[in-house]
């Protein structure tokens, strides 16, 4: 094992802000990180739905970093879109905005796993809890390291995502200028791995996993069908070839969809409530897919 594996990060109590931009028609946001000495820069998708940093093989060259260490362990992992990857665990120095972190583990895949529309990205930056890590527990995940080793001013991160310019990911602090009103806090259990929180959608109680790597709102087909049938102006349909349920509505109409967290209502605006069109109708940005997460989690 690497002699510094699991060693503490240099204590800085720091904050950093990473500029992000959207790709693939506002379906994903990517930002820059650096790995190695000297640093090798790359763009990754920061994902609260996975725990590990996974990098494509053409983005990182171990031979070009004098701080790189190839561990003995292999890894296998998969994502909700069906992508499956495998490769080798490495340990090296990271930089996230202004924060420098030493000896963090990541996976270097054997083959490129990113799709054509993701070609600007070099990998996945997992931000969830370590209980869903696909690495041995001796390897600290990014979030685990930043929290346990007191690298940040506060153990928080903040996404601000929008079309075009102005999107950011802040580590270690909260920028109140990025939003209106007060913050709403909800409890999550780290043992679940995902950021799972109780919520309501149009008044009905649901359990949700907040996932920055997912473009639309996803629930089970039965629950989405129930939601659509209770929402004025929207009718339910299913694609039998994919077993996906969805809602359709006239594009000159704006259905009301409200998500409630911690007693605070968040009403989807006109741009948020629809994700494209089909046969002259607008598609509701809530779809039904079974077997994505357990316990009917949205």
Specify the residue positions occupied by each region the protein language model found:
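Flexible, glycine-rich surface segments
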Residues: 191-234, 239-242, 246
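Flexible, small-/acidic-enriched active-site or ligand-binding loops
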Residues: 168-205, 275-282
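Non-catalytic N-lobe/flap surface of aspartyl protease domains
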Residues: 1-184, 225-260, 283-298
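Extended low-complexity, serine/threonine- and proline-enriched intrinsically disordered segments
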Residues: 260-261, 266
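N-terminal acidic, glycine/proline-rich low-complexity segments
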Residues: 7-11, 185-187, 209, 262, ...
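Edge beta-strands of extracellular beta-sandwich domains
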Residues: 268-272
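Structural motif
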Residues: 35-37, 96, 196, 201-202, ...
């Amino acid at each position: 094992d690497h002699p510094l594996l699991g060693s503490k990060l240099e204590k800085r109590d720091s904050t950093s802000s990473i500029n992000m931009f959207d790709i693939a028609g506002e379906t994903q946001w990517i930002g820059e990180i650096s790995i190695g000495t000297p640093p090798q820069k790359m763009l990754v998708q920061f994902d609260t739905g996975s725990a590990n940093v996974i990098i494509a093989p053409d983005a990182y060259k171990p031979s070009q970093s004098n701080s790189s260490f190839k561990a003995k362990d292999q890894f296998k992992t998969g994502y909700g879109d069906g992508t499956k990857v495998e490769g080798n665990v490495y340990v090296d120095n990271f930089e996230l905005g202004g924060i420098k972190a030493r000896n963090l583990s990541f996976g270097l895949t054997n083959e490129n796993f990113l799709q054509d529309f993701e070609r600007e990205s070099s990998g996945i930056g997992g931000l969830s809890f370590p209980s869903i890590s696909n690495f041995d527990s001796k390897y600290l995940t990014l979030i685990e390291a930043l929290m346990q080793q007191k690298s940040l001013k506060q153990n928080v991160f903040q996404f601000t995502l929008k079309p075009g310019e102005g999107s950011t990911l802040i580590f270690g602090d909260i920028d109140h200028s990025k939003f209106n009103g007060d913050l709403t806090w909800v409890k999550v259990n780290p043992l679940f791995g995902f950021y799972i929180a109780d919520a309501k959608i149009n008044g009905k109680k649901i359990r949700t996993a907040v996932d920055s790597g997912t473009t639309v709102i996803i629930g089970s087909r039965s629950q989405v069908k129930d939601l659509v049938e209770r929402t004025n102006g929207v009718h339910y349909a299913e694609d039998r070839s994919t077993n996906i349920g969805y809602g359709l509505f006239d594009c000159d109409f704006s259905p009301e969809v409200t998500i409630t967290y911690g007693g605070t209502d968040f009403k989807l605006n006109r741009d948020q409530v629809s994700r494209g069109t089909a046969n002259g109708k607008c598609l509701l940005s809530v779809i039904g897919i079974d077997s994505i997460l357990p316990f009917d989690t949205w």
